[in-house]
């Protein structure tokens, strides 16, 4: 759902997908092939949010800021289920793990990976290609070329999802009884741990 706030209205590219159960308010720009999942809240009431092309904001993520701040989610960034980004900048092709929290004025360098449940403190600057994890978050190693390839392949699934949702997602009613259903499109993508 899109909401105007004091004359500020969201922009959503026609090739992006914002789930009807997401909440996008005010000064928010959402570009091509962006997926915004159900339960996501993007509050551009006090500042601005920019979601660049090919990024995704998954289910139950929250993006907000202190007044006058711009939150940048750069091209190809991947915000996992339930993460919170408050007044931070997320670089190109970054992966933010599920339920991670990224605080004000933190800067996440491109091709970095933030582990699930991590807490990135305010003003922390993470260089490009770093794996970060923990509470408080610490840099634990460099991101390999193989990790970047794995992350990029996963994000490509989400970059195709807006078109799929526009074409195939529709409200329905429950089946009267369970039946064996198979998605004809088998996707061979798995966790990093299982690939190594």
Q: Which residues does each PLM region occupy?
A:
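A positional/architectural concept
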Residues: 7, 12-65
